[in-house]
Design a protein with these regions (language model features):
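Conserved Class I S-adenosyl-L-methionine
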Residues: 25, 180-233
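A short glycine-rich, Lys/Arg-flanked "PGG" loop and its adjoining helix->strand segment in the class I
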Residues: 120-132
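Conserved class I S-adenosyl-L-methionine
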Residues: 1-40, 54-58, 75-78, 137-159, 197-201
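Short alpha-helix
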Residues: 166-180
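A conserved beta-strand element that flanks and buttresses the S-adenosyl-L-methionine
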Residues: 108
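Short catalytic micro-motifs in class I SAM-dependent methyltransferases
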Residues: 111-112
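Class I SAM-dependent methyltransferase SAM/SAH-binding core
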Residues: 46-48, 52-96
Length: 233
């Protein structure tokens, strides 16, 4: 089974759980977007790896149009069912976006990079489809700077969810931004307490796999999310 097929199967099986989590987080996410991203209301925005539309829905009241790209049909179906009029869902691969250069004023991705085999391609694609002077938004969990701690974290996450590839450290993300000549405008870091049992449920982690993940889980698991706002020059 290919990586993309595995991702489709995993998220198809847990689509309802992901949609419910999005609804619980919606108000908090909308508030963060309003505070973190300066917008005029005239932007055409991209949500790459949209899931059921968390980022797209947070952006929708603040921009002219949002295109939400997602690989998994079941997530698209749930997103479309609740999408506001200015949000359009399309099926696609965020490592190879089907848009012309400079198609968007803002291109963003939320909690996706740790699920893709080559995150450098995602950052390159976000940059490519953003117009000069436009902004790129990246938000994802970041790994500890200590390589041993990062390795242990990634081992746990892959055991919990085999579609997890690698959580990148802040320094790794900044190198990807620099490689694409993106200028960092703002960065913030948010700590997120994770209760183990619901976190395993979210991934559909069951049986022997669940027991293995529980044995590897960090004690009092607190994840760190990095939020990055960048300009394409």
């Amino acid at each position: 089974m290919s990586t993309h097929d595995a991702t489709r199967a995993r998220f198809a099986a847990t689509a309802d759980r992901l949609a419910a989590l999005q609804e619980r987080r919606a108000e908090e996410l909308a508030s963060r977007i309003r505070e973190f991203v300066p917008l005029t209301g005239e932007e055409r925005a991209l949500d790459a790896g949209a899931g059921t539309g968390a980022l797209a829905f947070a952006l929708a009241p603040l921009v002219r149009e949002v295109v939400a790209v997602e690989l998994v049909p079941e997530l698209i179906e749930r997103g479309r069912a609740k999408a506001p009029p200015n949000v359009t869902f399309v099926e696609g691969n965020i490592e190879k976006l089907d848009f012309a250069r400079a198609s968007f004023d803002l291109a963003g991705t939320l909690r996706t990079l740790h699920h893709v085999p080559r995150p450098e391609l995602v950052i390159a694609e976000l940059t490519r489809v953003t117009r000069p002077g436009g902004t790129v938004l990246v938000a994802d969990q970041i790994a500890p700077n200590d390589p041993l701690a990062a390795g242990e974290l990634n081992t746990f996450e892959r055991t919990r969810d085999p579609t997890h590839t690698r959580t990148l450290a802040d320094v790794d993300l900044r190198q990807l931004f620099e490689a694409n000549s993106l200028v960092l405008l703002r960065a913030e870091f948010v700590r997120e307490q994770r209760e183990l049992e619901p976190y395993l449920d979210l991934a559909g982690c069951e049986g022997e796999q669940r027991e293995q993940a529980k044995a590897l889980a960090p004690r009092d698991y607190t994840a760190e999310l990095g939020w990055y706002l960048l300009e394409k020059r």
